[in-house]
C-alpha cells in the first residue's frame, strides 16, 4: 500500500477505536495509510473497558475482538491502541464527553498522554456536560470547528487539492 498523503480518518466510538487501531497497527503499511486521525470518544484500551464497563455494553468487545479470557488476552493486547502507542507517528485529535460512562475519559486521556510523551501532535477537547455522543448544539459546532482546524491547519497546513 502506498500512503495517501492527504488522507485522514476521524470516527466515533467503535469507529474511534478503528481509527486508533489503524494508526497503531502492527503492519507498517496499514499504519502509514493515514496521515492523521480523529477519535470521538473512541476506545483506546479495550482490555480495561472489557473489565470495567456498564451492563449494556458489557459483551460488545466479545463481538468486536473476542471474549476476554486468559486465552484471548493477547488479542486484546495486540489490538490495544494505548499499549501500541509507540508505533503511532501521525497527529491525532481527540473529542471526549466528560460524563461518558461508555468510554470513560480516562481511556482518551491515557492515549493523549502517551502521544504527547512521544512528541506527537495532539489536540484534546473534553466537553463538560456531554456523555457518549454530543447533544449540545454549541459543543457539536465546537467539535466540528476544532476538527476542521486540526486537519486543515495543523495537519495539512491549508494545502488545497489541485
Regions found by a protein language model. Give the residues of each.
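Active-site-proximal cap/loop segments of hydrolase catalytic domains
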Residues: 1-162
Amino acid at each position: 500500500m502506498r500512503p495517501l498523503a492527504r488522507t485522514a480518518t476521524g470516527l466515533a466510538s467503535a469507529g474511534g477505536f478503528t481509527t486508533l487501531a489503524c494508526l497503531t497497527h502492527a503492519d507498517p503499511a496499514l499504519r502509514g495509510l493515514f496521515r492523521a486521525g480523529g477519535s470521538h470518544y473512541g476506545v483506546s484500551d479495550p482490555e480495561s473497558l472489557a473489565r470495567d464497563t456498564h451492563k449494556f455494553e458489557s459483551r460488545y468487545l466479545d463481538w468486536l475482538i473476542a471474549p476476554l479470557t486468559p486465552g484471548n488476552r493477547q488479542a486484546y493486547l495486540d489490538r490495544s491502541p494505548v499499549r501500541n502507542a509507540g508505533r503511532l507517528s501521525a497527529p491525532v485529535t481527540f473529542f471526549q464527553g466528560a460524563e461518558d460512562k461508555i468510554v470513560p475519559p480516562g481511556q482518551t486521556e491515557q492515549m493523549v498522554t502517551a502521544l504527547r510523551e512521544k512528541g506527537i501532535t495532539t489536540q484534546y477537547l473534553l466537553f463538560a456536560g456531554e456523555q457518549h455522543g454530543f447533544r449540545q448544539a454549541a459543543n457539536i459546532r465546537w467539535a466540528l470547528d476544532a476538527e476542521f482546524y486540526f486537519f486543515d491547519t495543523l495537519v495539512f497546513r491549508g494545502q488545497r487539492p489541485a
